[in-house]
A protein has these predicted regions:
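A residue-level marker of the well-folded mature domains of exported/periplasmic proteins
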Residues: 26-359
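C-terminal motif of bacterial Sec signal peptides marking the signal peptidase cleavage site
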Residues: 18-21
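Bacterial N-terminal signal peptides that target proteins for export
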Residues: 1-9
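Hydrophobic helical h-region of N-terminal Sec-dependent signal peptides
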Residues: 9-15
């Protein structure tokens, strides 16, 4: 993966951003710019978005550009967006939750530019929408694999920030763990960063030192997996198939496939019929999936997970189905009750089986 990225950057890097491709005659009036919170070489969140960008450029013929490692909560984001608009880019895709307020303000300022925000909830009626995926679906499946793999009964979860997106993933993962291994527990350690390999690795090591023999994560690098590999533990990565970084530790990963969604956004802009929405795609839509399961995982486990995957896609299984209690034993869902989207999107509690605090 990194060799492909290096070749791409070697061709087109300058002034802190990269312009890629020349577009087509049909798409001459539409140009799409992507703002990334991490480096393209993270092999995780940003890498997955850049794969989607490349796919969209190839499918639509539209010129694209990107800028990487743009921090949240600073003036850098707005400055980069203004630079892109000055260059004629009229589709702006921001790929981090913390960009949301800036994107909302910029969408009002530039009504002729399409703004699409990944992972947020803000939108308007004209030129600003949001996109995300039901990652809790493959998170649940990956938890089934992890629960089947643990021998100590303790799984460490290295996580960035206590926001609903991350908490929802931890809970779905834990419910999958419990489906395979009801006595196993998941302990969360917060890093307060999306991408810092040193911090991620240290956090994973702290969990390994506590006796965890499987590490899961909501982070952007493979550092946690490398620590698991060194300790002889197992690992569930995130964002992409990171098996190359820790092949002996790797179990599976919930992964993103942004390309088709980006094609839809860009094609709508080209046709001048972009309509803002809150898109929350699923495994059935293809925006999220489960990476291949490691070859040394018992076939009975693979069969169990694939059966659950088929049931989720068919609408016969929902990870957040009652009875469901929070970690203090309070009932959240009654037997057979399915959690509504609004409750999932605002989730700020841990389910039973999680060790740690959301605060």
């Amino acid at each position: 993966m990194r060799s492909k990225i290096a070749a791409l950057l070697a061709v087109c890097v300058g002034l802190g951003f990269a312009l890629v491709g020349c577009g087509s005659d049909d798409g001459a009036d539409t140009k799409a710019a992507f703002v990334y919170v991490g480096p393209v070489g993270d092999a995780g969140w940003t890498w997955a978005h850049d794969q989607g960008r490349q796919y969209a450029e190839e499918e639509t013929g539209v010129e694209t550009a990107y800028v990487e490692a743009v921090p949240e909560g600073t003036a850098d984001f707005a400055n980069h967006v203004r630079d892109f608009i000055d260059q004629g880019f009229n589709v702006i895709i921001g790929t981090s939750f913390g960009y949301m307020d800036d994107m909302a303000a910029l969408a009002d300022e530039f009504p002729d530019v399409v703004f699409e925000h990944v992972s947020g909830y803000s939108m308007n009626d004209t030129n600003f929408g949001n996109t995300f995926g039901r990652m809790y679906e493959p998170r649940y499946l990956s938890g089934m694999v992890a629960g089947s793999a643990t021998k100590s009964g303790l799984i460490g979860y290295v996580a960035a920030f206590p926001i609903p997106e991350v908490i929802r993933g931890i809970n779905a993962f834990t419910l999958g763990v419990q489906a395979a291994n009801p006595s196993a527990q998941v302990e969360v350690i917060w890093t307060s960063t999306w991408f810092d390999p040193a911090v991620e690795g240290d956090s994973a090591q702290a969990m390994l030192d506590k006796g965890a023999d499987v590490i899961a994560m909501h982070q952007d690098s493979a550092a946690a997996g490398e620590k698991a590999e060194a300790a002889g533990a197992r690992w569930v990565s995130y964002n992409s198939d990171m098996s190359a970084f820790a092949p002996n530790a790797f179990l599976t990963a919930p992964v993103w496939n942004w390309g088709p969604r980006y094609v839809d956004i860009i094609e709508a802009a080209k046709a001048d019929n972009y309509s803002p929405s809150s898109y929350w795609g699923s495994m059935a839509d293809g925006i999220v999936d489960l990476a291949p399961i490691a070859s040394d995982v018992d076939q009975s486990v693979v069969d169990m997970v694939m059966e659950a995957k088929a049931a989720i896609i068919a609408g016969d299984l929902h990870p957040f189905t009652g009875p469901l209690n929070d970690q203090d034993g309070n009932q959240v869902l009654g037997a057979g009750e399915v959690m509504e989207d609004g409750a999932m999107l605002g989730m700020m509690f841990f389910v039973e089986g999680v060790i740690g605090s959301t605060g």
